[in-house]
């Protein structure tokens, strides 16, 4: 009987995540657990959430869909689920800030999806100096940091204020789709080590050294940046606008505007950028 219950639970989780992928753009998932924050207090729509509190962090320990609302002050959302499980975080007018670290740290998951609810405005702000429990640690190092694949999508707006290092950092593949995304950073504004894809999104990147970066060098199918499907990207940065190790592609119908202090496109591999799309000005290039 116990074995059967576990099988049913696994099947329910799989159906929930399939529903996440099929949820129409801008709508929330009715199967989500609702998490409402007020300062450092949390109220939930169900009793058994699988969330534990560790040193000021609300730790999600089970895969599934979670809808986040309200204002989390001086805290952190941490995702720490088995590598075989996926997590969807629905931001529905959600604000979070941390005085000591990143407000969102995806430590482990198969992948994580941040879904921005229609009409919602969401803001995350990190600390100017991070405190690590182990001085040897250097992660997280971005306002939103993911150790695994991360997708940000939906028709809402997300503001990310990176005050310590990177604005958004992803160790694997970073995908941005359909949403409005405004990010500031001190070092790299957005970085996906393996890849960055921006599809049909409106993205504004300010501050920092490099604006969009992917630097994996040991795999020929990674280390790429793709801007597609009419994406609109505005960049104002101190160094390179777009930097990748393997390839950069900017499709026709997209626009990349703004100013950079370094190269507009920096890649030792393949560059395929539509000339009309590239409207950005470089301080070092004619």
Predicted regions and their residues:
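Bacterial Sec-type N-terminal signal peptides, specifically the leucine/valine-rich hydrophobic h-region
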Residues: 14-17
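Bacterial N-terminal signal peptides that target proteins for export
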Residues: 1-8
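A composition-driven surface/loop motif
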Residues: 9, 20-286
């Amino acid at each position: 009987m116990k074995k059967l219950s576990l099988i049913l639970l696994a099947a329910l989780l799989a159906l929930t995540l399939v529903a996440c992928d099929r949820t129409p753009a801008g709508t929330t998932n009715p199967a989500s657990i609702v998490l409402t924050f007020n300062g450092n207090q949390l109220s939930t729509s169900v009793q058994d959430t699988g969330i534990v509190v560790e040193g000021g962090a609300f730790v999600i320990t089970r895969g599934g869909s979670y809808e986040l609302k309200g204002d989390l002050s001086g805290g952190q959302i941490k995702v720490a689920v088995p590598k075989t499980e996926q997590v969807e975080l629905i931001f529905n007018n959600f604000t979070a800030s941390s005085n000591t670290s990143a407000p969102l740290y995806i430590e482990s998951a198969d992948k994580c999806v941040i879904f921005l609810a229609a009409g919602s405005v969401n803001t995350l702000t990190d600390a100017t100096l991070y405190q690590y429990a182990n001085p040897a640690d250097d992660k997280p190092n971005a306002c939103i940091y993911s150790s695994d694949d991360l997708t940000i999508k939906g028709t809402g707006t997300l503001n990310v204020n990176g005050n310590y290092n990177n604005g958004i950092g992803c160790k694997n593949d970073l995908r941005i789709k359909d949403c409005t995304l405004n990010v500031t950073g001190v070092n790299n504004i957005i970085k996906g080590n393996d890849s960055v894809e921006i599809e049909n999104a409106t993205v504004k990147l300010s501050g920092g050294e490099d604006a969009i970066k992917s630097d994996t060098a040991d795999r020929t199918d990674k280390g790429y940046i793709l801007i597609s499907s009419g994406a609109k990207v505005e960049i104002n940065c101190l160094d390179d606008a777009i930097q990748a190790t393997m390839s950069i592609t900017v499709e026709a119908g997209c626009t990349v505007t703004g100013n950079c202090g370094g190269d507009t496109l920096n890649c030792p591999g393949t560059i395929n950028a539509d000339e009309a799309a590239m409207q950005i000005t470089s301080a070092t290039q004619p």
